[in-house]
Amino acid sequence: LWDCRGETAWEGLVHRRCRMSPSSPTGGAAAPGPAAADGISIRQVERAGWELIQATVEVPVEGWYWRVTHELARRTSPPRPDAVENGTLTAPGARFDTPSGCVFYRLTDSDVVSWAQASGDRNPIHLLPGRAAEAGLSVGSGEVVAHGLLLGAISLALVQPSPSWQVGLVFIGSADVPASECGAEESWAMLAVDPVSGDITQGR
């Protein structure tokens, strides 16, 4: 995507799902997939006003090839008046009930910016307040969002490891992070992580 579109490759992208599983030993005779010249397979379709993207790659990790599949979406037309927008981890006004044993994490907008810079994710929804709302997410004009792999990394860091060697991350919503104003005390979003399931809930 970056090679084809440059900076615009990141505009408005929303991470929907990530699946990771071992496919074969790196020393085996089988060649890694997917069968693309650069080792990356990208599928794109247009549906109901959205561009849907699936990217698959295999990477070597500690003697195994791991197949990693990312599913992303980008709005291509304005939403209908009756359309249901992408949600957040906690709907506005909802009670913040968490299972017992949850681990709490304070996420600031500077954390989101640091993640975006370290990971090379130049998506403006992480960096510029208001851009997430323009991309179709249900957030305020003074907020940036954390979603996708940042939330997945927080979950994986705290959840109990799976014996199946498979990781499936489903990103059902974003965490709305208030942008701190210059000279004001730093604001944050409060996240609760279930250490058993890895589910993340956002407090208000």
How should each PLM-predicted stretch be described?
Residues 16-107, 174-177, 182-204:
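HotDog/MaoC-like acyl-thioester-processing domains
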Residues 6-7, 43-46, 161-162:
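Intrinsically disordered, low-complexity segments enriched in polar/charged residues with Gly/Pro
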Residues 73-145, 160:
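Catalytic strand-loop segment that frames the active site of acyl-thioester-processing enzymes
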